[in-house]
């Protein structure tokens, strides 16, 4: 999503499925299922015995180390046999969560968010809902044309657009596993135009196309295991959380956000939306953040789940030549006039 003030957490930026998510939404998808704050331990017999000391004794026992070696070998084999390539970016990532489970979680999350927003959602026949649906479906159609995309991930999905008409909410947009799309009217001034809306929607769509929800779920047991190992060294799970967040969870989240920026830019270009508008969107986002943070603390990127807007602008500028190439190869010059005339009706 986005930044803290805004899921693009999809585009929001948190400090965990975007812009910033409304404070009341605690579920973060693209970016990020987090079920606990780390492993916890219970001491017995007035501290004479602990899981920490027990785990250390296992490490020191020769026969136990053999079993640990076998366990490590099995886990390594499982890891390497579940490596997958992300579409468009071609990044290798570890995913073991099944597609049905991913869709089930998306459906559960949708019901929860629907209950919170249903009073503000515009009807499907509203002009703004129709406009955003048309933009989004052009992005989906463009994804089908990308040779690196597994079309089976898109087949059979019933895409539903929900425009949340709440100007006071934090600017936000996100796409859930299973095809449920939410975009808040408060983000539209930052989008400014159709190409800006496409920038936001393509980013959020990219999170689901790349299965970032499943990737986050797949990493959760690894983080728990590492937390257990760290506990044998630090003896304090608060320190474990700081280490895991600073060196693993947050960098991984920023990596997925950056990947969604890249995939989204390439797909929106293939859909004949102006790729250079993505830079302007993030410039407006950066200005919005400055206004919201006036007199506040400095937002440090390494403490955030999302890249800084300035870094996203740098990335977009670096990727723009390739995006322009895709735009030209998609015969967008002739399609552009038709598209503009269609939406001016």
UniProtKB/Swiss-Prot annotation:
Superkingdom of the source species: Eukaryota
GO molecular function, one term: metalloendopeptidase activity
Main location class: mitochondrion
Disulfide cross-links: 272-332
Keyword Hydrolase: yes
Listed GO biological process terms: mitochondrial protein catabolic process; mitochondrial protein processing; mitochondrial protein quality control; mitochondrial respiratory chain complex assembly; protein quality control for misfolded or incompletely synthesized proteins; TOR signaling
Native organism: Saccharomyces cerevisiae (strain ATCC 204508 / S288c) (Baker's yeast)
Transmembrane segments: 68-88
Post-translational modification: Forms a redox-dependent disulfide bond, which plays a structural role and regulates its conformational stability and activity.
Chain positions recorded as Zn(2+) binding sites: 203, 207, 257
InterPro entries associated with the record: Mito/Outer_Membr_Metalloprot, Peptidase_M48
Localization, UniProt: Mitochondrion inner membrane
UniProt keyword annotations, A-Z: Disulfide bond, Hydrolase, Membrane, Metal-binding, Metalloprotease, Mitochondrion, Mitochondrion inner membrane, Protease, Thioester bond, Transmembrane, Transmembrane helix, Zinc
Record's bilayer topology term: Single-pass membrane protein
Family: Belongs to the peptidase M48 family.
Protein name: Mitochondrial metalloendopeptidase OMA1
GO cellular component: mitochondrial inner membrane; mitochondrion
Activity regulation description: Protease activity is induced in response to various mitochondrial stress, such as changes in membrane potential, oxidative stress or chronic hyperpolarization, and depends on its C-terminal region.
């Amino acid at each position: 999503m986005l930044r803290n003030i805004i899921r693009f957490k999809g585009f929001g930026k948190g400090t965990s499925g975007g812009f910033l998510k409304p404070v009341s939404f605690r579920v973060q998808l693209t970016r990020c299922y987090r079920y606990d704050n780390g492993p916890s331990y219970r001491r017995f017999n007035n501290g004479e015995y602990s899981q920490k000391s027990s785990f250390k004794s296992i490490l020191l026992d020769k026969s136990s180390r053999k079993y640990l070696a076998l366990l490590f070998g099995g886990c390594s084999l499982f890891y390497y046999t579940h490596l997958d390539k992300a579409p468009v970016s071609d990044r290798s990532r570890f995913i073991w969560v099944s597609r049905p489970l991913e869709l089930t979680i998306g459906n559960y999350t949708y019901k929860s968010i629907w209950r919170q927003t249903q009073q503000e959602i515009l009807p499907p026949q509203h002009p703004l809902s129709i406009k955003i649906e048309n933009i989004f479906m052009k992005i989906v159609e463009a994804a089908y044309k990308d040779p690196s995309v597994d079309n089976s991930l898109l087949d059979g999905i019933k895409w539903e657009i929900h425009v949340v008409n709440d100007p006071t909410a934090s600017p936000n947009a996100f796409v859930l596993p299973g095809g449920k799309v939410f975009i808040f009217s408060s983000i539209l001034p930052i989008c400014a135009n159709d190409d800006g809306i496409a920038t936001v929607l393509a980013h959020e769509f990219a999170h689901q196309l790349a299965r970032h929800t499943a990737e986050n779920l797949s990493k959760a047991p690894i983080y728990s295991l590492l937390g257990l190992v760290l506990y044998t060294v630090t003896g304090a799970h608060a320190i474990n959380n700081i280490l895991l967040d600073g060196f693993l969870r947050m960098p991984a989240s920023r990596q997925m956000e950056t990947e969604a920026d890249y995939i989204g830019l390439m797909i929106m270009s293939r859909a004949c939306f102006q790729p250079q508008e993505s830079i302007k969107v993030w410039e407006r986002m950066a200005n919005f953040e400055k206004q919201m943070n006036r007199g506040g603390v400095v937002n440090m990127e390494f403490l955030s789940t999302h890249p800084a807007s300035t870094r996203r602008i740098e990335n977009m500028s670096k990727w723009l030549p390739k995006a322009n190439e895709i735009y030209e190869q998609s015969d967008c010059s002739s399609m552009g006039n038709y598209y503009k005339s269609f939406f001016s009706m």
